[in-house]
A protein has these predicted regions:
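Local sequence-structure signature of Cys/Sec-based thiol-disulfide redox active-site neighborhoods
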Residues: 1-26
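A short, glycine- and basic residue-enriched loop/turn
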Residues: 7, 13, 48-51, 64
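Thiol-based oxidoreductase modules, predominantly thioredoxin-like and allied folds used
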Residues: 26-39
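Short amphipathic alpha-helix with an adjacent loop that forms part of the alpha/beta core around
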Residues: 39-45, 76
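Thiol/disulfide oxidoreductase modules built on the thioredoxin-like
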Residues: 43-50, 68
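Non-catalytic, surface beta->alpha helical segment in thiol-disulfide oxidoreductase systems
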Residues: 56-80
């Protein structure tokens, strides 16, 4: 299961969702503004303060750059 903590104004969030969409990987998006999650709560949930924060099978991998690196090295599929 993939979960993305995102915000509507966040460009890297859009890039992350596009990458997952292009690879036909299902994910659950949690908009931190709509869910009323502040940065401290986000850090407790994910370990990170910024969006996106991406969780794959209960492991937080970080943001878009980390997701892209995992994809480019072929390790993304291993985590799924």
């Amino acid at each position: 299961m993939v979960i993305i903590y995102s915000a509507s104004w966040c460009a890297p969030c859009k890039y992350a969702k596009k990458l997952l969409d292009d690879k036909n990987i299902n994910y659950k998006e949690i908009d931190i503004e709509k869910a009323d999650i502040n940065r401290q709560e986000l850090q407790k949930l994910t370990g990170g303060l910024t969006v996106p924060q991406i969780i794959i099978n209960n492991k937080c991998i970080g943001g878009f750059d980390n997701l892209l690196m995992l994809d480019q090295t072929g390790k993304l599929q291993e985590l799924l």
